[in-house]
């Protein structure tokens, strides 16, 4: 079997995608080595990798496969005892150093797709911009900090505010409960107080649901608390919108209205949930902004990688480990008046990036001894000893249910249905729809996958069938060939500006005053948006949703369902994201083997 047939076989077995296979054939139909390299680069870019180091090939890490049988098949096709991968790349026409357009770029022992190399270059050029040390008024900064924080208190939120004041681009990252929402508000206040002219502020996020969260936190209460009357005249807010709306990206053509030739006229851009942004989108954002625009990216770099391509936030935040430059440390000590700040000094030539990163560590949501905090940290750090406690159900507010048989599967469905008893009771008692929606949002089922017995589609179907059998709901309606009933939850899958509903929003089916079916959504300031079901488009049943769909949302209680097979999608980041969606209680349905294998996969 030659390399072309082998790669096609891998695509048929879904080890790689058809896109990876066709890309490899486009690059070379004869050279097995280049064929393999191009398939690997294409495959790994979708797994969050910006580039592949040459060691990836020297150590036979092809497609991150651990199966030795597959690795041996690849090596057999290559038919060489020793390969000079660098030489093969440098001699092939499809690969260059970036000075001219070629499908692959080989640069400093790293292999890129050209478009990703170009995007990285553009981002790094922006990061190379110097800090604004010369223009900083340290006394004014100190006054601003004292206005926002306790004088005695020293925490990383203070550092985040200072770094925002002295940089035109900054990345603030932190796990759940580390105060990312609060820091957005404090940064806005600090920037207004530090402004020498009227400033135009824009808030944005990757999804409609995330923008809704921003709308909820941005209120006059905060502004009135910290700003003087004159300071309130020093700024204006643009309407909060998604990144696609902000850049004017066409749904049909993907053309971008705002770009390097047509810049956005804003002074400050704050982007939340930045972990969802891929490298190409970040490049587009930076291209559409003047170098005078201050941009703040906020997110959790340990969460799920972007859906489309390479993960840029995680890549950038990895430089935080290099420490701050001496100059930045000196400024931090001077402004905070805290001589005990003793961060690692950057001895590498990377401070142009690391000086622009603040990693928030203290959790305000969880006490350190709470079960959710312990488990999320254990997953992140791969502390497998903690899992012995998990499997014995001796972690507070975390419950592990092993699903190894049909009986245990039925037990899982029963537990989930019982978790919604209060929700159904409030429907029977015809409680206020706001109360019903809030009750539903107390508990959410999360699945890793869409298909199969442990996927969203089947779980939703079997829950509806079981609830109907148990007479939990007894009236069923079929409208536009779809099943409806009072109490049916749905999640919006695409923004609809006309109806005022956004991707990720969850609504509950109920009767209108005219006795017709409608779906109600709880909006800002406890406002209810009622939509007749006949005009609803782009939605799905949401007894269970995917972890991807839940990213950026939080619930009091989560039931997290893992598939019973060791699928490619099962990795540490998706498990970490699922666990950290809950504030109070977590039910995990899985096998011990699958859970541990998932944690150990990056």
From Swiss-Prot:
Keyword Cytoplasm assigned to the entry: answer is no
As recorded in UniProt, its EC number(s) are 5.6.2.3
* Top-rank lineage group of the source organism: Bacteria
Keyword Repeat (UniProt): no
A single GO molecular-function term is: exodeoxyribonuclease V activity
The entry's ATP-binding residues are 174-181
- Disulfide feature: none
What's any GO biological process attached to this entry?
Answer: double-strand break repair via homologous recombination
GO CC entries: exodeoxyribonuclease V complex
Function of this protein? A helicase/nuclease that prepares dsDNA breaks (DSB) for recombinational DNA repair. Binds to DSBs and unwinds DNA via a highly rapid and processive ATP-dependent bidirectional helicase activity. Unwinds dsDNA until it encounters a Chi (crossover hotspot instigator) sequence from the 3' direction. Cuts ssDNA a few nucleotides 3' to the Chi site. The properties and activities of the enzyme are changed at Chi. The Chi-altered holoenzyme produces a long 3'-ssDNA overhang and facilitates RecA-binding to the ssDNA for homologous DNA recombination and repair.
The record's subunit annotation is: Heterotrimer of RecB, RecC and RecD. All subunits contribute to DNA-binding.
Q: What is this protein's record name? A: RecBCD enzyme subunit RecD
């Amino acid at each position: 079997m030659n390399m072309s047939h082998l790669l096609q076989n891998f695509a048929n077995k879904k080890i790689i995608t058809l896109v990876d296979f066709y890309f490899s054939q486009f690059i070379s139909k004869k050279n097995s080595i280049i064929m393999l390299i191009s398939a690997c680069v294409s495959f790994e870019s979708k797994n969050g990798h910006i580039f592949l180091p040459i060691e990836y090939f020297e150590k036979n890490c092809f497609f991150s496969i651990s199966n030795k049988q597959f690795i041996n098949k690849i090596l057999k096709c290559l038919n060489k005892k020793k390969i000079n991968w660098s030489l093969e790349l440098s001699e092939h026409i499809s690969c260059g150093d970036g000075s001219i357009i070629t499908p692959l770029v080989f640069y400093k022992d790293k292999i890129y797709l050209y478009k990703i190399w170009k995007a990285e270059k553009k981002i790094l050029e922006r990061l190379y911009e110097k800090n604004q040390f010369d223009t900083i008024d340290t006394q004014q900064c100190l006054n601003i900090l004292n206005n926002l924080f306790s004088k005695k208190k020293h925490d990383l939120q203070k550092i985040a505010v200072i770094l925002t004041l002295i940089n035109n681009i900054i990345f603030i990252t932190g796990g759940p409960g580390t105060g990312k929402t609060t820091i957005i508000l404090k940064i806005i206040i600090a920037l207004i107080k530090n402004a020498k002219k009227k400033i135009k502020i824009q808030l944005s996020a990757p999804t409609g649901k995330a923008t809704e969260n921003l709308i909820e936190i941005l209120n006059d209460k905060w502004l009135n608390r910290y700003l003087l009357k004159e300071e309130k005249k020093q700024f204006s807010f643009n309407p909060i919108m998604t990144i696609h709306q902000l850049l004017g990206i066409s749904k049909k053509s993907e053309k971008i209205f705002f770009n390097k030739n047509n810049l956005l006229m804003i002074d400050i851009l704050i982007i939340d949930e930045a972990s969802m942004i891929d490298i190409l989108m970040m490049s587009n954002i930076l291209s559409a902004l003047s170098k005078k625009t201050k941009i703040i990216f906020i997110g959790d770099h340990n969460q799920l990688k972007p859906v489309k391509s390479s993960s840029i936030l995680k890549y950038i935040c990895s430089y935080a480990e290099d420490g701050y430059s001496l100059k930045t440390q000196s400024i931090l000590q001077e402004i905070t008046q805290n001589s005990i700040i003793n961060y690692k000094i950057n001895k590498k030539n990377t401070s142009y990036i690391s000086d622009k990163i603040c990693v928030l560590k203290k959790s305000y949501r969880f006490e350190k001894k709470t079960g959710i905090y312990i488990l999320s940290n254990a997953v992140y750090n791969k502390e497998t000893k903690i899992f012995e406690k998990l499997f014995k159900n001796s972690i507070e507010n975390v419950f592990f249910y092993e699903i190894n048989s049909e009986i245990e599967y039925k037990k899982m469905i029963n537990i989930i249905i019982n978790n919604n008893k209060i929700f159904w009771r409030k429907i029977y008692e015809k409680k206020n729809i706001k109360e019903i929606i809030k009750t539903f949002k107390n508990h959410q089922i999360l699945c890793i996958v869409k298909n199969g017995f442990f996927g969203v589609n089947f779980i939703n179907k079997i829950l509806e069938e079981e609830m109907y059998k148990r007479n939990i709901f007894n009236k069923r309606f079929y409208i536009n060939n779809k099943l409806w009933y009072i109490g049916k939850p749905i999640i919006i899958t695409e923004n609809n500006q006309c109806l005022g509903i956004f991707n990720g929003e969850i609504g509950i089916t109920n009767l209108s005053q005219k006795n017709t079916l409608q779906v109600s959504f709880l909006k800002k300031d406890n406002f209810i948006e009622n939509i007749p079901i006949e005009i609803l488009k782009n939605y799905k049943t949401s007894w269970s949703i995917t972890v991807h769909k839940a990213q950026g949302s939080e619930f009091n209680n989560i039931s997290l369902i893992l598939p019973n097979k060791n699928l490619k999608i099962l990795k540490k980041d998706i498990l970490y994201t699922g666990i950290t969606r809950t504030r109070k209680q977590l039910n995990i349905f899985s096998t011990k083997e699958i859970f541990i294998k998932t944690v150990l996969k990056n």
